[in-house]
Amino acid sequence: MKKYLMVIASYPDWRQEFFKTHMSSRNKEYCQIHGFEYIEITEKLEPVRGKIGWIKPFKVQQLLKTTLKDGDILTCLDADMAIVKKDIQYIPSSAKSFAYSIDSGNTHCMGSYSIRVNDWSRKLFDLIVDEDRYKNLHNQLTIHERFGTYSSFWEGFYDQASWYSLAGIKRHSDKPFWEYSDYGWHSDKTLTGEVNEWCKYSLEELYEHVEILPTAWNVTELEGESSCEFLINKTPKEDVFIRHFAGGQQWRKEWFEK
């Protein structure tokens, strides 16, 4: 079994140098501690489907098809993430195929995740980037319950919106998904109470293959550091494993001094 950590960082501004100085160095140190091979992609990349955000899931699918073997681990982090606690290993539990966190903003966040390579996880990423699903869903208007407005979820959230459709997760909830039955899986209901027709996975299959990790693994909002407009799942500062500078917030080098 081999373990890989993949990060894609291709910024046109100061963030690229910040990434190189802080994130890249920490990622390499983390890989050395836990025996990961580090895959860092920093060259200028062409958008996929007209969006930078689709590059990562298509790259994952490519690795699953061409490079990775059954039993291997592929962990992916967004480039705006800081690994804080170096002693925690980011891999799924032995019986699971896919692991990710419900973040501070109460999203089933695809900014970071870990894959145990097998037939199920290969099929998962085939579905995440599936062209027919994309054509049918990327222009579909859905309601954001906080704002009461309709827009395309897929146009701004790419693979995350795709995962929501596969697991039947409602687009937004101000009630923590931790308080839902089944983590919010199958919460996207029709008016008749049925789960959305685009949901692919049964609850039984989700529980068999997917592991939901604590919010400390993807801290996107923190008092004193971000707007906290979507601070729904709070994490004490001392418990943060991964600090995610999402949504245009300030990148803070002090997180790399820990």
Model-derived features: positions:
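Extracellular/periplasmic catalytic domains that process cell-envelope and extracellular macromolecules
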Residues: M1, L68, P92-S94, S104-H108, ...
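N-terminal anchoring/stem segment of glycosyltransferases
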Residues: M1-G71
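Short beta-strand/turn micro-motifs composed of small residues
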Residues: I8-S10, Y100, H244
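Conserved beta-strand scaffold positions in the cores of enzyme catalytic domains, especially
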Residues: Y38-I41, L74, F98, H209-I212, ...
